[in-house]
Amino acid sequence: SEYIRQILSEYKSPKFDYLPSFTGGLVGYFSYDYLGYKEKSIRGKAKDTEDFKDVDLMLFDKVIAFDNLCQKIILIANMPLDAPETGYNKAIVELKQLRELLMHGEKKQNMGGKLLGEVTPLFDKEQYCEMVEKAKHHIKEGDIFQIVLSNRLSAPFEGSLFDTYRVLRTINPSPYMFYFSGTDVEVAGASPETLVKLENGVLHTFPLAGTRPRGTTEEEDKELEAGLLADEKELAEHNMLVDLGRNDLGKVSKFGSVKVEKLHSIERYSHVMHIGSTVRGEIRDEYDALDA
């Protein structure tokens, strides 16, 4: 964490209202296993069969941002402050090179993508049910409040993951979408949920739980919404996530600043609707994004 903080302090990109929220810096992922470095008691013993790194971050000092609303491209090049004149001239050259690449670069052919075989789960039904029973035991014993049991689905794939991601953006537009190509891993995904966000000293987390399919008509959509908001099980699960969100933000927020800004709001997406809430807090002076 301290090494990452050092990089962030040395390569801190300025913020301007007329520019995108990201103008340069670190991009990548922290795996769930990374939490074990902060919370020793929950460090996992299982081996990841895909050999994902615990942390994979890349530093970017140039950005090409596409404004979907205004349909325009913004080119950004960062410059060091220790040699402003040299840095400025270098940034101008880099911006011209980026523009030339976009205007006259070789056009990429869309390769698409397809699955070459059946989708298979990591755990079969018997193994998964065994995990459920084990989880229920730990809940009864008070070891945990809630657990998300995952089951990886795998299939052989051929083609371009980036082109597949472009299709995903079209058929399932979501608030949180990503494509990441590292040295040894390529990942794409779409999610309605942003786990945590820190901006201008304010933390937000967005609990999302409780799901129904979208209706084929507006009337059916409203009926499904009413049924979702009347479902005691769905509301209980959602309220637990809200409480956990308040508790988590409270660990790094100023006393008395944690509040529920929005509770039990229906959020609609292309295929489903969810119950969503928003929890905010003001981060303490001694903490930063890595602590959050």
Regions found by a protein language model. Name each.
Residues 1-292:
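Extended alpha-helical targeting/anchoring segments
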